[in-house]
A protein has these predicted regions:
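Glycine-rich phosphate-binding loops of nucleotide-dependent enzymes
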Residues: 2-516
């Protein structure tokens, strides 16, 4: 694109035929985050990068994008040694990154967001008409349909992601790093994204695709590199990969990916919502006349794009948000707006979405967190006054062993545990109460594939015991794997409910966007 007086100047440079990272080492205090990792990307390919939390994926890509600097090793672009000092440096070398959590300003338009941080040949004046025209040109080339004049807050999640891609392309990115790009997309939006990625690859771009969804990796990538404990396990052509093989490479042992559920033996209703309404944190409608029944011995999955009332639903049931209309009953008793302690006393357990905020107290020990809400129970106290710490530690040690929680001791502060082990601790605590009703909100978000496997097994075991489980998840694969019934939420309402028996994924995706 020629640079005229009225244009913003894109900073990207020429095509990247090859990018190679060799012997990359990165140390943090007490941690070897990257241990002589080799990784390369070629023009025209989609290279998937897999690994559990802490495997080194983020560290490696942050070094490629200039956020970290390697202690040892070399980066070469088109066979020329290259030092990337900052994200600006990375952009100038033709490297763009699409973060999992979009870096957009909601109140600004598409064109204004794309122009942020760019240099103008007119000093402080930005000719947004020129930016908009270039955005439309790129949109046509790569089928990234978006109106440059719309504010970001009016766009769907999939459209916001297109803006992120457009911004990188506008800056001249020849290589794109995509971090968990499908995490919050509907099935239809995933299909649209994959068409865009394939077109970018066909046009000569190199793409790094970071994901934990193995079936998507197999569908979209040409090669796969797996990291474990800061080291590269292997790089193989995707044509030679299978889901079990990739999972075993990630974890170091065989992983159960498919679950054989026992036949449904549903019992009486344990939880019922009748026309429940509630306000969101912004004072707008969060829930709109939601009705739902949950029976003992079944898992009901709540599917939907994030922000469509799932959080409000969980909080209304668990006494953390006021129900403004309608009723909530547990085992036939009206518990509408009952306090959490009262709900806990009648057998309702809750695995919260934000485990570090609502699930644990970071400065408390593992043992102290294990007995949260139960610290006054007769089995842990004398006359409900003096706590029996030996009994608390004994119970906690049994839970650590049963739930395979990795911790140095019961006295270790929770803040030092990994996300997966914190989630196992919350799960152990909630299930130790033998609940009649379990609300599980995003139970595997941000945890490793090994911990995910364990949590899924525990939920299915709890189902078979007769517990009524409400599973709220943004991961449609998780919903489909565990649920007996699936209800879809959109704009605070339940817009559809299906029995999970060869469910039509496309139909679910349509419901998630408000279709019928």
């Amino acid at each position: 694109m020629s640079q005229t007086e009225n244009q913003l100047l894109p900073t990207g440079h020429a095509r990247i035929d090859s990018l190679t990272m060799s012997g990359i080492v990165k140390r943090f205090p007490g941690v070897l985050a990257a241990d002589e990792i080799d990784f390369d990307v070629r023009s025209g390919e989609i290279h998937a990068l897999l690994g559990e939390n802490g495997a080194g994926k983020s560290t490696l890509m942050k070094m490629l994008y200039g956020l970290y600097h390697p202690d040892e090793g070399e980066i070469r672009i088109n066979d020329a040694p290259t030092i990337i000092k900052s994200p600006i440096d990375a952009i100038q070398h033709g490297i763009g990154m699409i973060h999992q959590h979009f870096m957009l300003v909601p109140s600004l338009t598409v064109a204004e967001n794309i122009a942020l941080g760019m240099k103008s040949s007119r000093g402080f004046q930005l000719d947004l008409d020129v930016v908009s025209q270039r955005v439309l040109e790129l949109s046509d080339i790569y089928n990234l349909k978006v109106d440059p004049h719309l504010p970001i807050w009016q766009l769907a999640v999939g459209e916001q992601q297109r803006v992120e891609i457009l911004r990188a392309l506008y800056k001249g990115a020849a290589l794109l790093i995509l971090d968990e790009p499908t995490a919050v997309l509907t099935p239809q939006e995933v299909d649209g994204l994959f068409r865009i990625l394939n077109q970018l690859a066909a046009d000569g771009h190199g793409l790094v695709f970071i994901s934990h969804k193995l079936h998507e990796v197999l569908e979209i990538s040409h090669r796969v590199t797996v990291l474990r404990d800061g080291r590269r396990v292997n790089t193989i052509p995707t044509s030679q990969a299978t889901r079990p093989k990739l999972a075993e490479m990630m974890v170091g042992r065989p992983v159960l990916l498919e679950y054989e559920k026992n036949p449904l033996q549903a019992r009486d209703d344990r939880l019922a919502l009748q026309d429940v309404s509630a306000l969101s944190n912004r004072g707008t409608t969060g829930l709109d006349a939601v009705s739902l029944q949950l029976r003992g011995g079944e898992i009901v999955g709540i599917a939907g794009v994030s922000g469509n009332g799932q959080q409000e639903l969980a909080q209304c049931i668990t006494g953390l948000r006021e129900v403004t209309a309608g009723s909530v009953t547990v085992d036939g008793s009206d518990v509408t707006n009952a306090p959490p302690a009262a709900l806990h006393a009648i057998g309702l357990s809750y695995i919260p979405e934000e485990r570090m905020i609502d699930g644990v107290i970071k400065e408390f020990s593992v043992a102290e967190n294990y007995v949260l809400q139960d610290h006054g129970h007769p089995k842990y106290t004398t006359a409900r006054i003096f706590m029996l710490f030996n009994k608390i530690r004994q119970a906690c040690r049994r839970a650590i062993q049963q739930f395979e929680i990795k911790t140095p001791s019961t006295e270790t502060l929770v803040k030092s545990l990994s996300g997966g082990n914190i989630q196992k601790l919350v799960l152990a605590r909630e299930l130790s109460r033998d609940p009649g009703v379990l609300i599980a909100a995003q139970p595997t978000r941000g945890v490793d594939i090994g911990a995910t496997e364990y949590i899924h097994k525990q939920l299915l075991e709890e189902r078979d015991k007769g517990t009524a489980i409400l599973l709220i998840s943004e991961d449609l694969d998780e919903i489909r794997a565990l649920s007996d019934r699936i209800a879809v939420m959109y704009e605070g309402r339940i817009v559809g409910e299906v029995v999970n028996d060869n469910v039509d994924v496309e139909q679910l995706g349509l419901l998630m966007t408000g279709g019928v």
